[in-house]
Amino acid sequence: MSPIILSITIIAYFMILFAISYIAGHKADNEGFFVGNRKSAWYIVAFAMIGSTISGVTFVSVPGMVQASGFSYLQMVLGFIVGQFIIAFILVPLFYRMNLISIYEYLENRFGASSYKTGAWFFFISKMLGAAVRLFLVCLTLQLLIFEPFHIPFIINVILTVLIVWLYTFRGGVKSLIWTDVLKTFCLVVSVVLCIYYIASSLHLNFSGLVSTISDSDLSKMFFFDDVNDKRYFFKQFLAGVFTVIAMNGLDQDMMQRNLSCKNFRDSQKNMITSGISQFFVILLFLMLGVLLYTFTARQGIENPGKSDELFPMIATGNYFPGIVGILFIIGLIASAYSAAGSALTALTTSFTVDILNAHKKDEAALSKIRKHVHIGMAFVMGIVIFVFNLLNNTSVIDAIYTLASYTYGPILGLFAFGIFTKKQVYDPYIPLVAILSPALCYVLQSNSEAWFDGYQISYELLILNAAFTFLGLCLLIKRKSSAAPINSSLIKKH
């Protein structure tokens, strides 16, 4: 595709994005930035959440996954749905009852300052690296399609990308994010549906032919029960999906900031359940698209790219279809990647301001000043991390993110699980040590699992092991004659 056409498409999208961001975030105060003033309609948040769970990584990588993994990803997505129900009926009422700005305030109330800072710092590392990986993917794609033809270096690409994310989130925060996520969801769903339509048309498939082509393909196998050593094994994927969504959605300030913007916890529960079920069908569309892409390359004799992540971009922008397919791909990619990055930047700003600096205890004017400075700082750090990823990239992006989450979200999951399901008090100053040792032990296990466990490969279930080690470590720190954890009444507010 012509770089000029792509540039015009991107500029048009950003004009719409900035207009929505300005209208939604107009006159937003600090509460509006952090939790949307808790006035968001649940059905708007639910629609927005469908898109917020889909990043540029999903948009680009999931269609290419079908060659190696078939539809096995849906096994994990089924686990996501179960995890969403757990979040809706356990975590959401708890967070609303405590009237939290940052969900990691719960750890201070339950254990103490050390666990609070541990949770906040682990989130900071997780979200910063995860957001950087996602933006790195879109930067690579834009570099190939737009910046490279104009001989613009990668560093300029990164600077412009981060600057755009900062600009449309600096004013409205969560209030802006919800409405920009609505735009993102609409663009994503329309893009993938129309891409399926145009590719099916080029293959001369009507609806029944489309369904039979996908269902008859070896790439559409969904359930894997045969080999427990296979990374696609059902119970590995399903259980990993349950715990991954609890950790990456329920215990993630980025995702929960939208849920906490609903008027009350019952509205938030409706949002969680609706968006969780809808996500299954959206992911199914991406996998269907992947089967069609591989079917198309096979019939046309097109050599598949070296990396599965490159399949969708190569076909969509390679003049194999009408130009609208390439435009739809770019809109979908930009919508997913920039919205996810903006959400992460807002969450990082909130967590660092509230959890690390404790600035929420200051007056409104001082808080606004600190928040704006932190927002700039987070954008700068994100740009640096993206550039470093460009130097280190050597693995599938989606695997890298889930593996990363297993190491960094595991201690957070273990901390919350211990706090919610036990009433024991622990020696708070030693909690950071447990949070560091648990991922280290998991790394040793994962590196040697095949040799130690007769060929068994640890994959996404690493998150469960990590949380379990953290939980056991906290058991070793239980105080003698412990009683129920004290509750800070100042944090509790009934809704």
Predicted regions and their residues:
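Membrane-embedded helix-loop-helix hairpins and adjacent transmembrane boundary segments
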Residues: M1-H495
